[in-house]
Structure formats: C-alpha cells, structure tokens
Amino acid sequence: MRLSLCLLTILVVCCYEANGQTLAGQVCQALQDVTITFLLNPEEELKRELEEFDAPPEAVEANLKVKRCINKIMYGDRLSMGTSLVFIMLKCDVKVWLQINFPRGRWFSEIN
C-alpha cells in the first residue's frame, strides 16, 4: 500500500497523548474530522478545515498538494482506508472510556 507511512503517521498522532488533561489513546474530534476529510472529502473542504487552525499558508498548500495525490487513489480504496481508521479511532476512544469507568476491570485487558 502506497500510503502505509502516511496512515501510520496519522495513527501515531491519533493515539498520542495530546496534553496532560487527556488520556493516551483519546482521539481529538478535530483530528478525526480533518483525517476523514483528508481521505474522502473534496480539496476545498480540507482547505476550509485547515484554515480554521490558522495554519500558515505554506502548510495549507503542502497538505493540499498531498491531498491532490490522495485524490488519484480510487475512491473505494480511500473509503476502505477511512473505514479502517474509524475503527481504530473508535477502539482508542473505547479504551479510554473503559480506563476511566473500569480502572481495574477485566474489560480493558480483553480489548488490548
């Protein structure tokens, strides 16, 4: 798969502890939105989302350049990648919920 490094990088960012107030594995909603937009939605929508973060124009253009390459992949393949990412993000969020609500529970060990 050509995008394996790109997808692995997204997963690392998704499952990395963003700050001291979030638990490791909790996926930021904004990151989820941008990631799915990056894979599946039109370039114009990605540009709007990136501009919400006040990113430098060079960074926005670099992302759009990669997006143009991604858009050359068949939509069905991109949809499969997006589906896989959604399942992984959901698993990360479920782990966090279980850690919070069942800190010593057997459920957490079952999904590791």
Swiss-Prot record:
Its main location: secreted. It holds the Pfam family Uteroglobin. Linked by three disulfide bonds to C3. GO terms for cellular component: extracellular region; extracellular space. Residues 1-20 form the signal peptide. Keywords: Disulfide bond, Lipid-binding, Pyrrolidone carboxylic acid, Secreted, Signal, Steroid-binding. The keyword Phosphoprotein does not apply. It is found in: Secreted. The modification Pyrrolidone carboxylic acid is found at residue 21. PROSITE patterns: SCGB (PS51311). GO terms for molecular function: steroid binding. The keyword Iron does not apply. Part of prostatein which is the major secretory glycoprotein of ventral prostate gland. The heterodimer can bind non-polar steroids, cholesterol and a group of small proline-rich peptides. Belongs to the secretoglobin family. Lipophilin subfamily. Prostatein is composed of three different peptides called C1, C2 and C3. These form covalent C1:C3 (F) and C2:C3 (S) heterodimers whose noncovalent association forms tetrameric (C1:C3/C3:C2) prostatein molecules. This is Prostatic steroid-binding protein C2.
